[in-house]
Amino acid sequence: MKTTCLLLTLLFVIGLAACSKSDDPLPEKEFQDVNKTAEDYLAEEPDLEDYYNFFRFQNDSDYTLYWFINTKFSPGGGLYYCRPGQQATTLIAMEYAWWLDDYEILIDNLMAVGWIEFYFDLPAPDDLPDWRVPNEFQDTCAMYVFTALEPNSPKKTPKDPSQWKFEKFSDHSVRWTYRVTNADYDEAVRQTEERWAEKDDGE
C-alpha cells in the first residue's frame, strides 16, 4: 500500500512539473537589455498615483526587429530596435481619470492594446537613410489591430494571450512580455506580400 501511494505521489509530482513547463509560453532565456527595464523604472520611486504598464519584446528571431505598440487609452511610445538576442521595454504610464468610466489605467487585459507593428530585417536607426522610417508599404511588416483577441490561435500571434508572459508587480504596475520568433517573421512576409499584391491590383 505504501509503495502504491509513493508511486502515485511521484507520478503526480512529475505530471505537475511537465504541465508547468509546457504551460510556460516563455521558457527561461537570457536577452540583452537595450534600454531601461521595468525594474530600473520601479527602483526610481515612481509616483504612487500613476499606473505603470510595461511592455517588453524579446527578439528571438534571426532578423533585426523594429517594434511599436500603443494602447486604446494612450498615444503609445516610440519605435524600438532590437538585434537578435536583445530585448527592449516601453513604459505606458497613466493617471486615474475619474470622469472616464471605462478608463483602463492598469492594463491587465490585452484588449486595452490598440495595435502592434513588427518590422524585420532593416538596418539600425543610425544606418537608415535620412528621413527614412520603417513603413508597411516598403518593408517586411506584420501589423496587429486589437479589435478582438485570438486565444489559442493555431498560428503564433501577439493577439493570442497565451503567447504572453504577464507579471503583476503591484496594484500600480504590470509587465507584459512577448517573444518574437521566426514565426512572426514568416507572418510578416505573408502580410507584406498580401499588401503588395493588393497595391499592384489597385494600379
Regions found by a protein language model. Give the residues of each.
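C-terminal motif of bacterial Sec signal peptides marking the signal peptidase cleavage site
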Residues: 15-18
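N-terminal hydrophobic targeting signals that begin at the initiator methionine
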Residues: 1-2, 20
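Sec-dependent signal peptide recognition
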Residues: 2-9
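Intrinsically disordered, low-complexity segments enriched in small/polar residues
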Residues: 20-58, 62-203
